Amino acid sequence: MTNRIEMMIPLLLYFFFIMGIALWGNKKTKDKTGTSGFMEEYFLGSRSMGGFVLAMAIITTYTSASSFIGGPGVAYKVGLGWILLSMIQVPTAFLTLGVLGKRFAVIARRTNAVTITDFLRARYKSDAVVILASLALLIFFMASMLAQFIGGARLFESITGYSYQMGLLIFGLTVIMYTTIGGFRAVVLTDTIQGIMMLLASTAILVAVITAGGGVANIMSSLQAIDPGLLTPQGAGGSIPKPFILSFWVLVGFGILGLPQTTQKCLGFKDTKSMQSAMIIGTFTVGFTMLTMHLVGALGRAVVPGIEIGDLAIPTITLKLMSPFWAGIFIAGPLAAIMSTVDSMLIMCSAAIVKDLYFHYVARNDETKLPPRKVRLMSLSVTGIVGVLVFFAAMEPPSLLVWINLFAFGGLESVFFCPTLFGLYWRRANAMGAILSMTAGCAAFFFFNISKISVAGTTAIVPTLVIAAAVFIAGSLLSKDNTNDAELHKIFDF
């Protein structure tokens, strides 16, 4: 009992600190007058992110339970090869901001875009594109949040010894409350704190593993004795074939350009200098976190052998090597990764309902029909309701948790990748191409996953994006040419 209390103290202090930031963010939203002013503040923080905050917001939104629990768990099983594979994720911030950042930000300011759907509306001038994007975002985000809620509660349960329901209650209600109260500004500031917690936690547990193992050389000798395959790029038992590496490059490499939760951050930074510094800081942060946590998993097998379930590797290693108080500080790291993913998705779900659907199609962009007080109440209510729905769904966790998360992220990429990228850089891109690509991409992703059909040994995301791109290009070329649209030229600088 004493150990539990000692473990909970740093966690509770951390949660209270986050709630304080949310209350400060809430005060900022009250300072904004007018419907548009409130929505820009609540959903985008008035485009005020500096470089460090922007870097942390992108990286912490991208990283999740898999970065701290799932990935290191696989590294525990297959060895150093998985660390090499995880490094594919290092350019996340550099790629997102380098390819999308400045162009996205300029267009967003010209069109007053607050969400990714606002951008799609301005680019394609199609209600079908907007509605498809909003529905896909809501469905896949809620599925992904469900997986994150369950992952957070199970992590809490495995380390503290409290029940799954208690973990879900503490974790779930905390993230729902601070996101609902504080909006985007609270989200990015808590993401910054959570990014720092992730760095500290990953460093602490790696030092503990190396110390307990008697140094890196000794640990490597132990891994060699367990299975020489643990030290090879192909992994134990040749479990990392080349087609899988290609698939990983697509899914967590350039495929991230199709994830709305990361591209949304491109709309909110302050200036070009902030973007450039974020590219450097973000690249270092994700590289350091991925390297340290996956090293913990791979090296941990020599220090704490015999863990049968990969997902239990990090919690078990933490409990074996750290005191209750420091274990409590460590758990804040992966919980921070999960919370920072959920909070961004919550705020974007609220924006999709209030800004993209209700304000545009019901209020017809008329601020008199949606005055500041009403939009404030509606935004806070929708954020809270979406969070509570996911919370109750997580009370009885489904057994197919891995598939839910896979469908969510792959589904988002299949829907948003082509309309976003082609919309920014290809003059001929039009609504027909976007509609066909979104529907065909989503259908293809589900087909390849359900049928288990593999193309040249790759996973579903590779043929899915090829099909989505081919359909987008064909649909755009075979339909009306809008390249001479004067308004389009003015907005997109073609």
Predicted regions: what they are:
Residues M1-F494:
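Membrane-embedded helix-loop-helix hairpins and adjacent transmembrane boundary segments
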